């Protein structure tokens, strides 16, 4: 292999580094990755890609984006990734200053209460990624890191199939990150087997600039075609005939928290409201295209004056507002809400059920058949049945992930993490 390498030049970035070319083009791609990782510590250059997409419409400040970029220099390449949470997306109760920290009534506690940045990395080969990450970031791992990347990956594949390193700090930036195999993320977006990450992606997120173009495009398409559409459909089946725009986004946001054991004391019970109220435009950017492309036959959009309009009109107004305020980092005035009215008839109801993810659809259709046997064919299925199905999926994955966290974070970090969550809940 060595004799097939050709010396091109010395690196201008680091005189100790040589730029090599291999006769095998596939190996050249490998060397590019290694070189990027070598430079990441000393002369970090993150290639900024155009991630101006529906998920990236949020209240993330430029300062927060800089902090995220600072963290990304630490890690090996990923296929897709996103940032989420109160440290990234504006939430009521977390009024961030220019440095991305949280304003509080007690300035002395500002640093303590500053929300951490949450990162998710989707990688093609978890064992290889952890192997690379352990070289420079072994301190991020619990005792499992000492057992090697193979063991770390095995633990990752359990349950929700994500491995978290938490309660970390770099240059004053608090953060945690989760690693999932790319194919497992796609599976959750399509089939809702855990709703662990698909639930987070039902809300505004910040797509990482180190995501590959291919990965970003594919995830966006799958998220829109399956995950976001299913979130709207599920919410329509749970909501009454007439409901507000806020009701829709609130119901969607609650899906991934229904059954989450962290909501029983360790997570802020107003979390869903706090997410929605500061990000109405972000939710509109996510869901009006879905409604316009797939669900107009099931929904009317009613303005405050009672007029019915196509959802695309509201979306265009939202985009104009976004362009007019592109230099603002927070919403200065609450956007006007619209009211939805679902077109409830047996055929529409059945059509919506048929679009749900596989296991949920099977159970709901079974209930329909039972109703037909009882001569209740004109009655809708009790929405609590659908709610309970979502509850079971989320509770199973959240409980398993919490237990797994004791091993991936270590007992001490796990206790500290829960303590921080409880403090956050008391705000």
From Swiss-Prot:
InterPro entries: Tam41 (IPR015222). Pathway: Phospholipid metabolism; CDP-diacylglycerol biosynthesis; CDP-diacylglycerol from sn-glycerol 3-phosphate: step 3/3. The keyword Mitochondrion applies. Its main location: mitochondrion. GO terms for cellular component: mitochondrial inner membrane; mitochondrial matrix; mitochondrion. It catalyses: a 1,2-diacyl-sn-glycero-3-phosphate + CTP + H(+) = a CDP-1,2-diacyl-sn-glycerol + diphosphate. It is an enzyme of class 2 (transferase). The keyword Cell inner membrane does not apply. GO terms for molecular function: phosphatidate cytidylyltransferase activity. Pfam families: Tam41_Mmp37. GO terms for biological process: cardiolipin biosynthetic process; CDP-diacylglycerol biosynthetic process. Residues 94-106 have a biased composition (Polar residues). Keywords: Lipid biosynthesis, Lipid metabolism, Magnesium, Membrane, Mitochondrion, Mitochondrion inner membrane, Nucleotidyltransferase, Phospholipid biosynthesis, Phospholipid metabolism, Transferase. Residues 94-113 are annotated as: Disordered. It is a peripheral membrane protein. It is found in: Mitochondrion inner membrane. Its cofactor is Mg(2+). Its EC number is 2.7.7.41. Catalyzes the formation of CDP-diacylglycerol (CDP-DAG) from phosphatidic acid (PA) in the mitochondrial inner membrane. Required for the biosynthesis of the dimeric phospholipid cardiolipin, which stabilizes supercomplexes of the mitochondrial respiratory chain in the mitochondrial inner membrane. Belongs to the TAM41 family. PANTHER family: PHOSPHATIDATE CYTIDYLYLTRANSFERASE, MITOCHONDRIAL. This is Phosphatidate cytidylyltransferase, mitochondrial. The lineage of its organism: Eukaryota, Amoebozoa, Evosea, Eumycetozoa, Dictyostelia.
């Amino acid at each position: 292999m060595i004799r097939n390498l050709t010396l091109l030049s010395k690196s201008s970035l680091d005189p100790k580094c040589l730029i090599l070319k291999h006769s095998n083009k596939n190996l050249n791609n490998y060397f590019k990755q290694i070189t990027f990782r070598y430079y990441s510590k000393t002369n970090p250059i993150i290639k900024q890609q155009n991630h101006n997409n529906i998920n990236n419409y949020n209240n993330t400040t430029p300062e927060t984006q800089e902090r995220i970029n600072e963290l990304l220099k630490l890690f090996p390449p990923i296929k897709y990734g996103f940032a989420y949470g109160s440290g990234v997306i504006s939430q009521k109760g977390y009024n961030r200053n220019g440095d991305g920290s949280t304003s509080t009534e007690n300035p002395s506690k500002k640093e303590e209460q500053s929300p951490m940045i949450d990162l998710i990395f989707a990688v093609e080969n978890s064992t290889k990624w952890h192997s690379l990450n352990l070289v420079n970031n072994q301190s991020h791992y619990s005792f499992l890191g000492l057992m090697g990347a193979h063991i770390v990956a095995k633990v990752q594949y359990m349950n929700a199939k994500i491995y978290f390193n938490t309660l970390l700090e770099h240059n004053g930036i608090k953060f945690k990150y989760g690693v999932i195999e790319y194919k497992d993320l796609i599976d959750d977006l399509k089939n809702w087997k855990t709703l662990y990450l698909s639930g987070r992606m039902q809300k505004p997120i910040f797509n990482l600039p180190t995501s590959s173009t291919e990965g970003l495009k594919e995830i966006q398409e799958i998220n829109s075609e399956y995950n976001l559409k299913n979130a709207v459909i599920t919410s329509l089946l749970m909501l009454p005939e007439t409901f507000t725009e806020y009701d829709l986004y609130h119901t969607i946001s609650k899906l991934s928290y229904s059954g989450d054991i962290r909501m029983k004391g360790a997570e802020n019970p107003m979390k869903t409201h706090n997410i929605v109220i500061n990000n109405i435009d972000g939710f509109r950017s996510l869901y009006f295209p879905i409604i316009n492309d797939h669900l107009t036959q099931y929904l009317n959009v009613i303005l405050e004056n009672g007029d019915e309009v196509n959802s695309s009109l509201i979306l265009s107004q939202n985009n104009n507002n976004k362009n007019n305020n592109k230099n603002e980092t927070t919403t200065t005035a609450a956007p006007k809400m619209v009211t939805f009215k679902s077109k409830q008839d047996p055929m529409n109801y059945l059509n919506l059920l048929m679009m749900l993810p596989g296991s949920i659809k099977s159970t709901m259709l079974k209930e329909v058949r039972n109703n037909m046997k009882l001569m209740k064919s004109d009655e809708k299925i009790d929405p609590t049945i659908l709610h309970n199905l979502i509850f079971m999926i989320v509770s199973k994955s959240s409980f398993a992930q919490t237990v797994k966290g004791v091993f991936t974070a270590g007992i001490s970090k796990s206790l500290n993490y829960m303590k921080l969550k409880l403090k956050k809940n008391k705000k």
